């Protein structure tokens, strides 16, 4: 009897010790692991003990538009953690690029259309409310991104276009002025002197490859339409087809995204690209993250790559894979296009992907910078210098 009692007490003692050990393991602190994307396609650097507070707040934008990023970061830091400043940061950052005429592809005095006029497209999206304000084909108003903000804050609409958008801007206190500069006028005169080459016309006469318009539709058998879809006649590049896309996130993962551009050089009057289109030029959702795009807007807007990138992150993929996915859908149909995509999740992890260039530069400001908050990063492009196999989706 005593032997059985002694054995029972020994078993009870062992069980108590085991329970104590398990409790200690389960309650001990664990290191946090967060992936910080290095900017190289398909690679990540996993850094231990990274917390949201160290990655956020954040400002990230397309291309090496440093001054725009620095200003946006300064504005974001006006409040602790960037709270209530993400909209101001995006609007003022993009506005800085408009004033500086970044690459002559943002703001006034760049990318004249067939009539020699510069028109502007811009958008602001709020990731908390999913509200959007945008303008397209804006004429005679320099502050495109600020007019887009007024559409967001003072109307129930998403987008205003053309002369009506300009009239709205006037009513909101913006002054009308010419967007043509001596440089943009010379650019247009040289283009017309070279028989309006290149241009965006097809299936018209006279032959748009050798002559200016006016053009008339050319009767074309249906078997010829696919042949004439080729876009190789007009070389798309960053100097004639560019956008600033910017994302700002505060420490509570409140997100704004914005874009601004003067569109494609020598475009047909009335053309609107991807920049002011929600889901194409930019998309933001506080629950997931945001994405911004740049490149051949006529192609990219058909596939809503920014929306696709955000939804890919929603499905659990990291930002770098989400950015690549946004481009793969396009490459299934268009192997001759140029474009880039930046994706950021709500915690501040980010990635980028590009196609048709050697590499794509972008600006990042966040507390995670080793040599200061603001840095230039690059990503090597698929289809830039080396041939790659495109996975059909």
Curated annotation (Swiss-Prot):
GO biological process: protein deglycosylation; proteolysis
Catalyzed reactions: N(4)-(beta-N-acetyl-D-glucosaminyl)-L-asparagine + H2O = N-acetyl-beta-D-glucosaminylamine + L-aspartate + H(+)
EC class of the enzyme, as a word: hydrolase
Signal peptide limits: 1-23
Glycosylation site residues: 49, 64
E.C. number: 3.5.1.26
Keyword Endoplasmic reticulum: no
Subunit structure: Heterotetramer of two alpha and two beta chains arranged as a dimer of alpha/beta heterodimers.
Record's function text: Cleaves the GlcNAc-Asn bond which joins oligosaccharides to the peptide of asparagine-linked glycoproteins.
Protein name: Putative N(4)-(beta-N-acetylglucosaminyl)-L-asparaginase CG1827
Lineage: Eukaryota, Metazoa, Ecdysozoa, Arthropoda, Hexapoda
């Amino acid at each position: 009897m005593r032997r059985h009692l002694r054995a029972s007490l020994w078993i009870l003692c062992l069980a108590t010790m085991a329970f104590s050990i398990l409790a200690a393991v389960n309650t001990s602190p664990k290191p946090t692991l967060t992936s910080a994307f290095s900017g190289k396609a398909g690679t990540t650097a996993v850094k231990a003990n990274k917390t949201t507070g160290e990655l956020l707040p954040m400002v990230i934008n397309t291309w090496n538009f440093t001054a725009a990023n620095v200003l946006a970061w300064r504005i974001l830091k006006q409040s602790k953690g960037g709270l209530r400043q993400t909209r101001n940061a995006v609007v003022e950052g993009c506005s800085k690029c408009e004033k500086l005429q970044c690459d002559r592809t943002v703001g006034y005095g760049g990318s004249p259309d067939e009539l020699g006029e510069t028109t502007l497209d811009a958008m602001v999206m709020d990731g908390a409310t999913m509200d959007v304000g945008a303008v397209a084909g804006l004429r005679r108003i320099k502050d495109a991104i600020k007019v887009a903000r007024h559409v967001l804050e003072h109307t129930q609409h998403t987008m205003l276009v053309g002369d009506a958008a300009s009239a709205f801007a006037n009513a909101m206190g913006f002054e009308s002025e010419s967007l043509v500069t001596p440089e943009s006028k010379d650019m247009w005169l040289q283009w017309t002197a070279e028989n309006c080459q290149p241009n965006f016309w097809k299936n018209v006469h006279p032959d748009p490859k050798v002559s200016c318009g006016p053009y008339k539709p050319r009767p074309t058998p249906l078997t010829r339409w696919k042949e004439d879809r080729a876009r190789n006649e007009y070389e798309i590049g960053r100097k004639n087809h560019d956008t600033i896309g910017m994302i700002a996130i505060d420490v509570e993962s409140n997100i704004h995204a914005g874009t601004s551009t003067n569109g494609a050089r020598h475009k047909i009057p009335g053309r609107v690209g991807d920049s002011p289109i929600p889901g194409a030029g930019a998309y933001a959702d506080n629950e997931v993250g945001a994405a911004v795009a740049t490149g051949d807007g006529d192609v990219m807007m058909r596939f809503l790559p920014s929306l696709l990138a955000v939804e890919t992150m929603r499905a659990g993929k990291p930002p770098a894979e989400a950015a690549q996915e946004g481009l793969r859908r396009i490459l299934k149909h268009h192997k001759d296009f140029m474009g880039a995509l930046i994706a950021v999740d709500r915690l501040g992890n980010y990635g980028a992907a590009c196609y048709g260039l050697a590499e794509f530069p972008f600006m990042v400001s966040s507390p995670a910078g080793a040599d200061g908050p603001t840095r230039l990063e690059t990503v090597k492009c698929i289809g830039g210098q080396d041939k790659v196999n495109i996975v059909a989706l």
